[in-house]
Swiss-Prot record:
This is Putative glutamate--cysteine ligase 2. It comes from the Bacteria. It catalyses: L-cysteine + L-glutamate + ATP = gamma-L-glutamyl-L-cysteine + ADP + phosphate + H(+). The keyword Ligase applies. ATP-dependent carboxylate-amine ligase which exhibits weak glutamate--cysteine ligase activity. InterPro entries: GCL_type2/YbdK_subfam, GCS2, Gln_synth/guanido_kin_cat_dom, YbdK. PANTHER family: GLUTAMATE--CYSTEINE LIGASE 2-RELATED. One of its GO terms (molecular function) is glutamate-cysteine ligase activity. Keywords: ATP-binding, Ligase, Nucleotide-binding.
Length: 386
């Protein structure tokens, strides 16, 4: 959970240096077999809390944990803190015969073989979601950017919609599900979007319309509050932020920070250019949904539908266009180098590309699917702590 403190005065509330924070979800695994845990061992989370404080929190399922940075306006601080969180948690895990994997899905985990975390919120969720809650064996990357004005948060949420598939394509890390290669580079959202109130947000005209939607659901007792709205991007219920939730968990910490730099820069660009996507409508959202699917299916190797040109554009070309769009903002925010790291991903590959390559090499060498999947898990556990 992001640790953004309350803002004390109107002057502070109305200022904005686009502070941001990053939340990463992880699978907790057996150190030897790399299998996802069924139950959290007694004392393990307490040991993590002793070392990391409230930077680490439990998740819906006992096989998962979340680590979060403190809010900052310095991209280097976020990178250093993410590395420290991973390394410290990794050392504590090793003392308990455990490890961590950062990926959108665990390659071999069986969703029907895990247990929910005991907590009032999670008990209620499992009662409501039933089997869908059990199938929520997925891990994502969440980035908060501070926008004190609620109307501005909803305005940016609407106008950023066409760019959400870019974040999905660049972060794909979930090509396996239940010991099978899915054929998708990012299977995570296929599973996650089984839940209600997921996917792309509706195109709310302003914060009043968004609050009316939330109030209707709360009044009908469909949800308790807006934290039960799980779109790919949403106004935070607890913090004065707009929270990006579209990306898969990133195996490489540098990729996570680069995506945070892109998101922060894009938010600033949209604030500075209120006319950009001002008249976004149903067709734009429909095209964004198509591109979301294409990002899940093909990752960085596919193409997006360009609505204005009515043609396909390669993802790497769309990425170049987006980087050029926000480069000035990234430079002003001091995160241009992190942003430019994204240009290395189409050539180096995402985590999904690496997992598939490891699987294919091991399968070619051994002829055994089980050993090939084990090689993928071993690579993931190692790369997560690099």
């Amino acid at each position: 959970m992001l640790r953004l403190g309350s803002l004390a005065s109107r002057e502070v509330r109305m200022s904005n240096d686009y502070r941001f924070g990053i939340e990463e979800e992880f699978f907790v695994v057996d150190a030897e077999t790399k299998a996802a845990l069924r139950r959290m061992p007694s004392g393990f989370f307490d040991a993590l809390r002793d070392r990391l404080g409230d930077s680490i929190t439990v998740e819906l399922l006992q096989s998962q944990l979340e680590m979060a940075t403190a809010p900052t306006d310095r991209i280097g601080d976020a990178l250093d803190e993410l590395r420290d969180l991973r390394h410290i948690a990794g050392r504590v895990a090793a003392e308990h015969g455990l490890g961590f994997i950062a990926a959108g899905t665990h390659p071999t985990a069986s969703w029907d073989n895990v247990r929910a975390t005991k907590a009032n919120r999670y008990d209620g969720l499992m009662q409501d979601l039933q089997m869908l809650g059990e199938r929520n064996m997925v891990c994502g990357l969440h980035v908060h950017v501070e926008l004190p004005d609620p109307d501005l948060r909803v305005d940016v949420m609407r106008r950023i919609t066409p760019y959400l598939p870019h974040f999905i394509a660049l972060s794909t890390s979930s090509p396996f599900w239940g010991s099978r290669q899915t054929g998708l580079m990012g299977y995570r959202l296929a599973a996650y979007d089984e839940l209600p109130r997921t996917g792309l947000p509706e195109l709310f005209e302003d914060n009043a319309a968004y609050e009316e939607y939330v109030a209707a659901l709360v009044g009908a007792r469909a949800i308790s509050d807006s934290s039960y709205v799980w779109w790919a991007i949403r106004p935070s219920q607890k913090h004065p932020t707009l929270e990006l939730r579209a990306p898969d968990a990133c195996t490489r910490v540098e990729d996570a920070v680069a995506l945070a730099a892109l998101y922060r820069s894009l938010v600033r660009f949209l604030v500075r250019h209120p006319e950009h996507h001002r008249h976004i409508g149903a067709v734009d959202r429909a095209i964004a949904n198509e591109n979301k699917w294409r990002a899940q299916r093909y990752g960085i190797h596919g193409s997006f539908v360009d609505l204005a040109e009515q043609r396909a554009i390669q993802v790497r070309d769309a990425l170049d266009q987006l980087i050029a769009l926000v480069a000035d903002d990234a430079e002003d925010l001091g995160c241009l180098d992190a942003l430019l790291h994204l240009r290395t991903i189409p050539d180096a590959g995402t985590s999904a590309d690496m997992q598939i390559a490891v699987y294919q090499e091991a399968h070619h060498r051994t002829g055994n699917r089980g050993e090939a999947l084990q090689a993928v898990k071993t690579w993931l556990a190692h790369a997560t702590l690099q």
